[in-house]
Amino acid sequence: MHVKKGDKVMVISGKDKGKQGTILAAFPKKDRVLVEGVNMVKKHSKPTQANPQGGISNQEAPIHVSNVMPLDPKTGEVTRVGYKVEDGKKVRVAKKSGQVLDK
């Protein structure tokens, strides 16, 4: 998967096209990611002891990983991802600026 938890990404297709956010969770087996503030759905919850009121809340739903692209840390634009071996470790590199995406 070309993106990881904590990456700044932009949605490149779908109803939330153009929105930016941080990846909250990644689901590699399903090829989906959870992006902050994107693909909001209404969740209905029954009253419980923890939440006696119950009601409707908004929360993020996962979107397919092909619909997001990481933002270049140098320019802030979307970029493709390349891979390079540095100090014996495989790191992700922004194709536009050549800057390393992994911390």
Curated annotation (Swiss-Prot):
It is found in: Cytoplasm; Cytoplasm, Nucleoid. It comes from the Bacteria. CDD domains: KOW_RPL26. GO terms for cellular component: cytosolic large ribosomal subunit; nucleoid. One of its GO terms (biological process) is translation. PROSITE patterns: RIBOSOMAL_L24 (PS01108). GO terms for molecular function: DNA binding; rRNA binding; structural constituent of ribosome. Keywords: Cytoplasm, DNA-binding, Ribonucleoprotein, Ribosomal protein, RNA-binding, rRNA-binding. Part of the 50S ribosomal subunit. PANTHER family: MITOCHONDRIAL RIBOSOMAL PROTEIN L24. One of two assembly initiator proteins, it binds directly to the 5'-end of the 23S rRNA, where it nucleates assembly of the 50S subunit. One of the proteins that surrounds the polypeptide exit tunnel on the outside of the subunit. Belongs to the universal ribosomal protein uL24 family. This is Large ribosomal subunit protein uL24. It comes from Bacillus subtilis (strain 168).
